[in-house]
Every structure is written in C-alpha cells, then in structure tokens.
Swiss-Prot record:
Origin species: Haemophilus ducreyi (strain 35000HP / ATCC 700724)
UniProt-listed SUPFAM superfamilies: Class II aaRS ABD-related, Class II aaRS and biotin synthetases
Catalytic activity: tRNA(His) + L-histidine + ATP = L-histidyl-tRNA(His) + AMP + diphosphate + H(+)
Family (UniProt): Belongs to the class-II aminoacyl-tRNA synthetase family.
Localization, UniProt: Cytoplasm
Protein's name in the database: Histidine--tRNA ligase
Stored CDD domains: HisRS-like_core, HisRS_anticodon
Enzyme Commission number(s): 6.1.1.21
Length: 423
C-alpha cells in the first residue's frame, strides 16, 4: 500500500462537523459588515515580496522570520502573511482611493511560518477591514463599534475586552524610542538574545515581551502617551470621548504597540482570557502613511483584522451547548422500478418552490433500511419516501426523523403546501 500523505504541520483541514460553525461565524461577520455599508474586495494570496518588506517593515518578526517566500524565475514572491498591504496595493493599482473614500472588507487565508499551537497556525484565516480617506477619529470609533456589534451577534461580548493606545506620529515615536532605549540599556542583563536584537532593531516590540522580569522593569519605563504630538493627543482624546458616550468599555494600555511598523496614532486589540496565551482575537489601528509609502497619493487609512480560528475557538469555548442548523432538511428515499425519476423530479420541485430548504437525494441504491440509516447519519429532519405503491397512487410518505415518529401519506400534489407548514 502506498504511503499516505499528511497535511503540512500547522495547516489544518476543516471537516464537515466543523464547517457549519465556520459558516455561521463567517455569515455573522458578513451581515454585520453589510449593516455598516462596507464592500467586499478579493486579493491574491501571493504578492511580490518587496510589498511586505516595505509595508510591514524589514526588521519585524513577520518579514524577517515568518514569511513563506520563493522565487518565480527572477521575481521573489510571498504567500501573504496579512491582508492590509495587499489591499493597499490593490487600491493604489486600480485607483479605488484616488480622491475617494472607501470602506472595504475581505476574508481569506494568510500564511506565517510560526510554531503551531492552539489558536496559532501556519495557515490561518482573517476577516479584515480597511477604510481609506477619512482622517477624523469618528471612523476609528465606528470600527470599534462594528466589532463590538459582531461580538454581540456571536454571543461572546462578555468574554472580550478592549485595549486601546495611541502610538502617535513617526516623529513622536522616534523621540520615545530614544528614551526607551536609554532606559532599557541599563537592564540588558534581563534580556535574552531575541530581546537584545529587538532593542537594536525594533525596541518598541519589547513592550509586549512575555519575559516577566522585564515586564516588571517596564512598569517604570517612559510612557509612550507622554511623548505624543498634540495632533495625536487630541485625536486619541476625541476617540475616547466617543467610546465613552457610546458605552464602550476599554482599558488604555500604554504598552500596546502592535507588531507591524505601518501603524500610527490609534492602535487597539480585543483580547480574551478564555483561550490561554493566544488571547488577541482582533487587532488594528491607523496607518495614515502607508498608502504614500507604497507609491500612492497621501491617503489616511485605518483598519483591523480578526483571527477567524481564534474567533471560532472562542465561540466554541463560551457556547458549548449551541445548536447549529443541520446540513439536511429533507432526505429523498426511493426504491423500486421507475422511482428514481420521480424522486429527482420531486427534489427539484422542492428546491424551486422552497429554495431555503436543504434537500438531499439518496443516489446510492440499496433497500429502504439502508437509506434510512443514511438519512439518520446526515441528521435529516424529514424523509420523503417513494416506492412502487406511491408511484402508482401518486402519493408520497412523509416521515419525521428528529422530533417525533410521525409518518403520513399525502398526495404528491399537496407536498409543497405540507412542507411550507413544517419549515
């Protein structure tokens, strides 16, 4: 027997038992985004490698350690590790944002070469939102309100908390970076090799270290909020006022900086304690310089991304008894000469008249007992049975499979009316 081939480590299959929950979560995401007037876009999963190096930053962990990159003839390509850079590239290329506001969303797989663990995978999925051309803090607030509404729709609002910060302008961060490096230079004995490298290349990333001893020292470090430029300070104050007025609870976290270099001003994360160490379910912020950095006209930007694997895990964790719609409403059971055509005709009539119903035709042969076992396996609600006697009398047997043992025989002409009453 030939050796079987397994999925790549950290890249997972989604089974039929799992996909209904994924579909339900994704449907809620789409519905909430539509209710705010956002439009879907779709981008390639492969982009030119320099796009991510320029957008995310060459000294970030994502670009320096985690990207899947390969050569195609003389061009270096990368499986996208996140969605913002590709969305900005597409917006510039196709003129979506030239003198124009846009509120966009996308959903799909991303790829990072990380150590796989619960809630962190090498292929993972994100729902991302990007808004272009709006400078004021009202749009920052709208994105946070949008995510809060999604948590309510999913029944997880009590298990997520909002962390908020402002990282100011590029100049403000440069001043803060210098002060932070001066402070940390006296504590290098507490750092491992990776943290020492970050101190040189990207010192703000040390603020979210998992090193407990270093975290204790950072409590006395200079605070980024103290170095904000006046415009960023006012922007952040107005955002906080809006959130207060709308009843959104949040914690100002002065150590929150996000892991990508393109952010400025507002940054935020929705976090949970229900998933262990992988507690960030949604993160985002402003990137007002990114469009120009990638060759477009100066255009303000703000957005967020939701990790769908973590979102699905959280829904499972806090709603252990939730019941999702079954995959099949009606199962067509038929046996005997000439019953196949009639079963197919009836199935298509139901689909035409009641398109919301999920109708499965058996197709596999066998006796009635075998077919009913299959109907039970797919958890169908109702079986419709056609045998030679039903064919001769133009009747059909309707049998309840879930909530009762009811079984009735009705005229085929009355079937659609009967199903309309039951569904």
């Amino acid at each position: 027997m030939a050796k079987t081939i397994q999925a790549i480590r950290g890249m997972n299959d989604c089974a039929t038992t799992e996909s209904p929950l994924w579909q339900w979560v994704e449907s809620n995401v789409r519905n909430v985004l539509a209710s705010y007037g956002y439009s879907e876009v779709r981008m390639p999963i492969v982009e030119s490698t320099p796009l991510f190096a320029r957008a995310i930053g060459e000294v970030t962990d994502v670009v320096s350690k985690e990207m899947y990159t390969f050569w195609d003839n003389d061009e270096q390509l990368t499986l996208r590790p996140e969605g913002t850079a590709g969305c900005v590239r597409a917006a510039i290329q196709h003129g979506w944002i030239y003198n124009n506001e846009q509120r966009l969303w996308y959903m799909g797989p991303m790829f990072r070469h990380e150590r796989p663990q619960k809630g962190r995978y090498r292929q993972f999925h994100q729902a991302g939102v990007e808004v272009f051309g709006i400078a004021n803090p009202e749009i920052d607030a709208e994105l946070i309100l949008l995510t809060a509404r999604l948590w309510q729709a999913l029944g997880i609002e009590q298990h997520l908390s909002l962390q908020l910060n402002s990282i100011g302008s590029l100049a403000a961060r440069a001043n803060y970076r210098a002060a932070l490096v001066d402070f940390l230079a006296n504590h290098t004995a507490l750092m491992n090799d990776e943290e020492k490298e970050r101190l040189v290349k990207n010192p703000l990333r040390i603020l979210d270290t998992k090193n407990q001893a270093l975290q204790a020292v950072l409590n006395d470090a200079p605070k980024l909020l103290d170095y904000l430029d006046e415009e960023s300070r006012q922007h952040f104050a107005q955002l906080c006022q809006l959130l207060d007025a709308m009843g959104i609870r949040y914690e100002v976290n002065p150590k929150l900086v996000r892991g990508l270099d393109y952010y400025n001003k507002t940054v935020f994360e929705w976090v949970t304690s229900a998933l262990g160490s992988q507690g960030t379910v949604c993160g985002g912020g402003r990137y007002d310089g990114l469009v120009e950095q990638l060759g477009g006209h100066a255009t303000q930007g703000v957005g967020f991304a939701i990790g769908l694997e973590r979102l699905v895990l959280l829904v499972q964790e806090v709603n252990k008894t939730m019941s999702l719609p079954k995959a099949v409403d009606i199962y067509l059971v038929y046996a005997g000469d000439n019953t196949t055509l009639k079963a197919f005709q009836i199935a298509e009539q139901i689909r035409n008249a009641l398109p919301q119903l999920r109708v499965m035709t058996h197709c596999s042969g066998g006796n009635f007992k075998k077919q009913f076992k299959r109907a039970d396996k797919v958890e169908a609600k109702i079986a419709l049975v056609i045998g030679e006697s039903e064919l001769a009398t133009q009747t059909i047997v309707l049998k309840e499979l879930q909530n009762s043992s009811e079984q009735i025989s009705i005229d085929q002409a009355d079937l659609l009316a009967e199903l309309s009453k039951r569904f």
